[in-house]
Design a protein with these regions (language model features):
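NTP-binding/hydrolysis catalytic cores, primarily Walker-type P-loop NTPases
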Residues: 387-464
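Active-site phosphate-binding and catalytic loops of NTP-dependent enzymes
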Residues: 55-56, 82-88, 104-115, 157-174, ...
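Switch/coupling sub-region of P-loop NTPases
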Residues: 222, 226, 231-238, 247, ...
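AAA+ ATPase "lid" subdomain C-terminal helix
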Residues: 183, 377-387, 400
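P-loop NTP-binding catalytic core
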Residues: 115, 123, 128-231
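N-terminal anchoring/assembly modules that precede and organize ATP-driven motor systems
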Residues: 1-138
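Conserved glycine(s) of the Walker
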Residues: 244
Length: 464
């Protein structure tokens, strides 16, 4: 959206003049009203009085932040000169910063996007903006003016990527320039007003060392997972919403050899692979006429024609699970994907359901045979009560016994309690079971110590 259009929208409903009453006192609400009045006055003056040169600065496709701040600052100074006691002088920088964010960024939530400690932003209407920090949800002090203000920011998110939202299509998924995932839903579906959910995209890809330091897994588990990737084991990362599946998938991909051709498929591109030979594919929703949709399933089918060494699907949700399983069963070993499930056993059941959504009449046993021959390992990722994220199970998918897929846990997290700070305590343990796919380790030249799968106590203490 053009800056001038944004300014005009934000400036509507202002008082007919730019005079700001001086309040003697009193409450924080009154002070905030004065601040908002001054800010709206600056909006109004910029729209009405800007020179052609200033208009060029504010309307440029590529705005220079310093020039925009200078233009805004001049008008802020003009208003404060006429009303020196309206707000403290110290608020001058805040006004300039807020107006700059309205013009160059996403308004009130721009500062939250810049905060590296915040991982998720949830706008529930204009007056409630929640954030996730260090795994915990909290109400931020950020607010929008009203529903129209939220809608202006939504338009700012969607316009650059050609997406559209209105009452006839009141929900949309999008992506910010930095790759952060955005979901938007508006009235009449959202009764509290326009809602925005932003899953921030990590600017720097995490390494396995980061996950070890976070307590997501231990060194022995990391060594085993690395060996599995190098031995071309097909892996499913299972977990609930916000459990860290995509982050873990990113780390797993870092173990793939540099000389392999990798095709990634996602709804919204989040993976940050470090290898050179990577092809990134992204699905596309239908346009406003209802045509032009390209699904994950379409992309999986196409990826098979692209001579991939490995296929990575960001998440399977529907019928594409069948195509992914067939890819794993037809020479694309070492492929990776994620799915929403709370336990390894639930993940297998979810895969069954998703295969049925492909629209083919298949016996349940045939589906389970496909799953058991394709998926070899499940990493169960969980978000625990204290906000921490851990790989709680590493489970081998074995074979069919009758009509049941058999599994065995290789590693698991054992919780022992909670400390005085409310942090869960526990440790990772090896169950002592050896996976049945060790032959693939030998075939691919991957070696592990002979006592690697011994229970931790027998192997001479815990392996960290």
């Amino acid at each position: 959206m053009k800056v001038l259009t944004l300014l005009e929208k934000l400036g509507r409903g202002n008082q007919p003049n730019v005079q700001v009453q001086i309040f003697a006192t009193i409450s924080s609400e009154t002070v905030d009203n004065d601040y908002q009045n001054i800010k709206q006055s600056v909006h109004k003056i910029i729209v009405e009085q800007m020179t052609p040169t200033e208009q060029m600065v504010l309307s440029a496709v590529q705005q220079e932040a310093a020039e925009v701040e200078q233009v805004i600052g001049n008008y802020v100074d003009k208003v404060l000169e006429d009303n020196p006691f309206a707000v403290p002088v110290s608020e001058r920088g805040r006004i300039v910063s807020d107006l700059r964010d309205e013009m160059l960024g996403l308004g009130p939530i721009e500062s939250l996007l810049k905060d590296p400690s915040i991982t998720e932003i949830m706008v529930n209407g204009p007056k409630k903006v929640f954030i996730e920090r260090m795994g915990k949800l909290q109400l931020s002090g950020v607010q929008f003016h009203d529903d129209a203000h939220v809608m202006n920011i939504i338009e700012r998110i969607l316009s650059p990527i050609g997406r559209h939202i209105d009452e006839s299509t009141p929900l949309v998924d999008a992506r910010l320039k930095d790759g952060s995932r955005v979901n938007i839903i508006i009235p009449p579906l959202a009764l509290c007003g326009p809602c925005i959910t932003i899953r921030k995209f990590a600017q720097k890809a995490l390494s396995v060392e980061n996950l070890i330091s976070f307590g997501t897994l231990d060194r022995k588990m990391a060594d085993f997972i690395k060996a599995c990737i190098q031995a071309r084991i097909n892996i499913l990362v299972s977990g609930g919403t916000g459990s860290g599946k995509t982050t873990t998938l990113n780390v797993l991909s870092s173990f793939i050899p540099e000389n392999e051709r990798i095709v990634t498929i996602e709804d919204a591109a989040e993976l940050k692979l470090q290898q050179t030979h990577v092809v990134t594919l992204e699905s596309r929703p239908a346009n406003i006429e209802g045509s032009g949709q390209i699904t994950i399933r379409d992309l999986v089918k196409n990826a098979l024609r692209m001579r991939p060494d490995r296929i990575i699907v960001g998440e399977v949700r529907s019928g594409e699970a069948l195509d992914m399983l067939q890819a794993m069963n037809t020479g694309h070993d070492g492929s990776l994907t994620t799915a929403h499930a709370n336990t390894p056993r639930d993940a297998l059941s979810r895969l069954e359901t998703m295969v049925l959504m492909a629209g083919f009449e298949m016996p349940v046993r045939a589906i389970r045979e496909q799953i058991s021959s394709a998926i070899e390992l499940i990493l169960q990722q969980s978000r625990l009560k204290d906000g921490s994220r851990k790989i709680t199970y590493i489970t081998e998918v074995q074979h069919m016994e009758g009509d049941v897929i058999t599994t065995q846990d290789l590693f698991r997290f054992e919780q022992t309690g909670m400390d005085a700070d409310g942090k869960l305590t526990g440790h990772f343990v090896s169950t002592g079971m050896q996976p049945g796919f060790m032959e693939k380790f030998q075939t691919n030249g991957v070696e592990l110590p002979e006592d690697f799968f011994m229970p931790d106590e027998e192997a001479g203490g815990r392996y960290y």
